[in-house]
Design a protein with these regions (language model features):
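Bacterial Sec-dependent N-terminal signal peptides
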Residues: 1-31
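Composition- and surface-driven signal marking solvent-exposed, interaction-prone regions
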Residues: 7, 227-228, 381-389, 463-472, ...
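Short, compositionally biased low-complexity segments
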Residues: 19-29, 66-75, 133-143, 260-261, ...
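Membrane-proximal, proline-rich intrinsically disordered regions
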Residues: 22-75, 82-85, 90-93, 101, ...
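Structured, solvent-exposed acidic/aromatic patches
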Residues: 70-405, 440-445, 453
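C-terminal functional modules
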Residues: 398-532
Length: 532
């Protein structure tokens, strides 16, 4: 980790003054980089952190959406392979470094550790540690970011989650005190925070994220009593004054795009004309069409061969997903023959500003509803009705995609060069009445319904959360076992290998952690503590 801890704090893009002559030492100093001892506005550091919090999980074009089994590439030149051939993960220690610096600079500016930047720093660090631990297992945490320790020791995954939950609680407490003495609806930092959220919204985000972390610990809720997983979850739900959470989609933490300098990823990458290279995955499309889910029309277009055979664009059986088990060459041939549905070009490929699709949700209200429903189904929060939160989650997800009862919905085309295919009438009432959607009760069947609907609600948002939920619960059943998976055993991996930086600069501690967890081998098929 040596190379991560000695870099300067932040590059200043435009120098505030011009030097007209060289002075002694100038050749050793970069005038465009702030020294470690400089005072840098906390707002500037916040801007950097919020701009980089999304870790390569751009909608549609990133591999995550293939790994989550939402879409399938039938043409490697544009959308790569579908192989789950994971290797070394990236890391989030850069976020930790900047968060520590934001705390330092905020203390210089405000003279206390109860300011809003200090609170947000706790959230960013907790999120960063959980992000990496979710991928590999044990990680350096307590010693990470200490510039005097170049080879930090590893902390157990349990300790990582325990300490992250404590940091989230600290962040909530600080924000609660600030909100009591200030306007809750005031933006935290209009210049620095690219999410543009208020004090109240940030507090809701932090507590909503804590619910995500707690539900991710469901397999450890009974055999690690000291974590108090169920009690912590119940405390948030039972005390909304102390722990406010999201109440609507308007509280979603969203990353928005524009056509000028932050284009929607498909357009930014130049893939807009190539919608025909991306099919919708069978895993998600089968869940949708089986229950006459109107989100089918938002995500996909009918398989051309089904229309040629005489089916209407509103016929759910005309929507056919591609199976990732199938080798890509076969997928390509079948796609050319019109056998599969394609991603809705009108929605996801047509606008450089992403004007026709939903914004990217980093953390959202629909997920929160399903997390609460899951906890209620599991008996964590007596008195909370799982069915109510399940239905709230479904309706919130429909709202994200702007679907309303009786709406005439235009079915798009394949690549923007052809006429639209027709229209379908959105029928939410019929969808909600389907036997597979009506809540089956606080039992295993009801839990499966909650998890399936959460999975659908994650379409094109929230990064790897679909994968993590599926890894933890087995729901929905992911396609695997075929040659299209691209691993030696044609099975989906359950973790990543450790970052290359750890191998290069912290090898002794890494080897010790591997011995403790996995018998000494860094294996993508080994189960971590979180999901054993």
């Amino acid at each position: 980790m040596k190379n991560k801890l000695i870099t300067p704090i932040i590059s200043i893009l435009f120098a505030s003054s011009v030097f007209t002559a060289c002075q002694k030492g100038d050749l050793l100093s970069n005038p465009n980089v702030a020294a470690e001892t400089s005072t840098v506005p906390a707002s500037l550091i916040l801007n950097h952190i919020t701009a980089t919090l999304q870790r390569g999980e751009d909608p549609i074009i990133s591999d995550v959406w293939k790994y989550d089994q939402y879409f399938v590439s039938n043409y490697s030149y544009y959308f790569g392979s579908n192989f789950y051939n994971w290797s070394n993960t990236g890391h989030t220690y850069d976020i930790v470094k900047y968060a520590n610096k934001m705390e330092e600079q905020a203390f210089k500016q405000f003279g206390n550790k109860t300011n809003v930047y200090y609170a947000l720093s706790k959230f960013f660090k907790a999120h960063s540690f959980v992000w990496l631990s979710d991928r590999v297992g044990d990680i350096p945490m307590y010693q990470a970011g200490d510039v005097t320790i170049l080879e930090p020791k590893y902390d157990s995954q349990k300790e990582v989650f325990k300490n992250s939950l404590n940091m989230l609680d600290t962040a909530n407490t600080i924000l609660g005190a600030l909100i009591s003495s200030a306007n809750a609806n005031t933006k935290v930092d209009a210049a620095g925070d690219i999410y543009g959220m208020t004090y109240s919204q940030w507090q809701k985000v932090i507590n909503t994220y804590k619910l995500r972390v707690l539900i991710s610990l469901s397999k450890r809720a009974d055999d690690n009593a000291d974590l108090n997983v169920k009690a912590q979850f119940a405390a948030i739900i039972s005390n909304p004054t102390k722990y406010p959470i999201m109440t609507a989609n308007s509280d979603n933490m969203v990353y928005t795009y524009n056509s000028a300098y932050n284009q929607y990823p498909v357009n930014r990458a130049g893939y807009s004309p190539y919608g025909y290279a991306a099919n919708v995955n069978k895993t998600v499309l089968d869940l949708l069409t089986t229950n006459k889910d109107p989100r089918t029309f938002a995500f996909a277009v009918p398989a051309p061969a089904q229309l040629t055979a005489g089916k209407a664009v509103s016929d759910f059986t005309a929507y056919v997903g591609a199976d990732v088990n199938i080798p890509q060459a076969t997928l390509s041939n079948n796609s050319t023959a019109g056998m599969y549905s394609f991603i809705n070009w009108n929605r996801y490929f047509s606008s450089a500003a992403g004007a026709n699709c939903e914004p990217y949700i980093f953390l959202g209200y629909p997920e929160m509803c399903f997390n609460i429903a899951e906890a209620a189904n599991r008996g964590w929060i007596p008195g909370t009705v799982a069915a109510d939160w399940y239905l709230k989650g479904i309706n919130a997800s429909l709202g994200v995609y702007k679907l309303t009862q009786g709406q005439s919905f235009v079915i798009g085309n394949l690549d923007g060069t052809k006429p639209n295919m027709g229209t379908a009438t959105i029928d939410i009432t019929t969808f909600l009445a389907q036997p597979g959607v009506v809540y089956a009760g606080d039992n295993a069947s009801g839990l499966t319904q909650i998890l399936n609907q959460k999975y659908i609600a994650f379409f094109s948002n929230s990064g790897f959360q679909s994968f993590y939920n599926q890894r933890r619960t087995g729901v929905p059943a992911f396609s695997q076992g075929g040659a299209g998976i691209g691993t030696p055993n044609n099975k989906i991996p359950v973790r990543w290998l450790y970052p290359q930086d750890e191998i290069n600069f912290n090898n002794a501690n890494l080897k010790s952690a591997l011995t403790t967890q996995f018998g000494g081998t860094d294996d993508v098929n080994s189960l971590m503590w979180l999901v054993k």
